[in-house]
């Protein structure tokens, strides 16, 4: 899959604009200088932390429309959702966003406070059942 993406990057003349960085420990620094972050796993992720971190930094995300990333983008950047496997749609959207970056909604949905509150509520309901 990576070979296919790299070939498309070259085919569309984007090799000066897109980097494939592999596994890194300085991902926040890499993301902060990125124009777009891609989440193109063919298998759905349960939560999609990288996508949410990117959106929180103001970096738009283009992702396949499934899993936790889909839930995030529906709330924060619905235009970033692409049907799984539609790589040409990914490339075309990336070209548009390089020219004119999209606006990202403020993340009021996926916050630590809300996650903690929801988790505590689950425990409270279970305790009340007993």
Q: How should each PLM-predicted stretch be described?
A:
Residues 32-46, 59:
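Acidic donor-binding loop of glycosyltransferase active sites
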Residues 75-87, 95-99:
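Conserved acidic donor-binding segment of nucleotide-sugar-dependent glycosyltransferases
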Residues 1-4, 15-23, 30, 81:
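Active-site donor-binding acidic/aromatic loop of nucleotide-activated sugar
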Residues 99-129:
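A charged, aromatic-enriched C-terminal amphipathic alpha-helix characteristic of glycosyltransferases
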Residues 23, 30, 86-93, 111, ...:
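Hydrophobic alpha-helical packing elements
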Residues 24, 42, 59, 63-70, ...:
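Short glycine-rich donor-binding/catalytic loop of glycosyltransferases
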Residues 28, 51-56, 70-71:
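Short alpha-helical segment that forms part of, or immediately flanks, the ligand-binding pocket
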């Amino acid at each position: 899959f990576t070979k296919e993406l790299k070939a498309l990057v070259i085919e569309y003349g984007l090799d000066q604009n897109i980097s494939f960085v592999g596994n890194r420990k300085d991902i926040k620094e890499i993301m902060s200088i990125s124009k777009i972050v891609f989440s193109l796993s063919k298998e759905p992720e349960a939560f999609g932390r990288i996508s949410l971190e990117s959106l929180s930094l103001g970096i738009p995300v283009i992702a396949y429309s499934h899993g936790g990333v889909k839930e995030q983008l529906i709330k924060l950047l619905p235009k970033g959702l692409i049907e799984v496997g539609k790589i040409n749609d990914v490339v075309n959207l990336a070209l548009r966003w390089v020219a004119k970056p999209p606006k990202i909604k403020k993340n009021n949905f996926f916050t630590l406070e809300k996650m903690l509150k929801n988790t505590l509520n689950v425990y409270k309901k279970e305790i009340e059942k007993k």
